[in-house]
Amino acid sequence: MKNKKLLTMVLAAAMVVGSITVPAPMATVKADTVTTSRTNILREDGVVVSQQHGSARSLIDGDITTVWDTNGWNGSQAGFPGSGKHNYSVWAEFTLADYYNVSDFNVWFKDETTQKNTAWQYKIEASIDNSNWDLVVDQTENTVTDKHFENIVGKDYKNKIYKYVKVSIVGAKTDMKPWPAMTEFAAYGERATAL
């Protein structure tokens, strides 16, 4: 009987310990740099943008004080002022360091007076061939005004292999007149073992 109680207690403890999940470390903003224990899988020399005013390399330099922004406010006014909705069509496309199963992304938007209280609307797509794109993160109806977003890839795409990633700013919900601008973009995942 004593052994049965001991076995029951050991099994119960094992079940509790086995059910505890520890969240993976996510990139966080600290001061003027991006701090993470994970490696951004975007290649430094593999970024192409639709247009730029600030350097496209600013998106992956780990410094949130550097900015990639567009050539000014070019959105559809959609009834501005007062409508609160602007449409954009700007993007940044990245080549991954290798073929990856991409798991998640971090996006940092510019934080200044004209961007305050702006809910940036964006989408993230991924491709293996740079021609056929999967919509892996859809924030095109976003109404949250944060400047940093952690995005988990949709379950239908977690096991797919990708070589290219594109983030597109498609809109903004605000009464301001902001230029589309991002300070940092990061992708995380596991290197694919086979194609």
Which residues make up each language-model segment?
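Feature responds to low-complexity, polar/acidic, surface-exposed segments characteristic
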Residues: 24-27, 37-39, 47, 142
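Solvent-exposed serine/threonine-rich low-complexity stretches and specific carbohydrate-binding patches
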Residues: 135-144
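Bacterial Sec-dependent N-terminal signal peptides
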Residues: 1-10
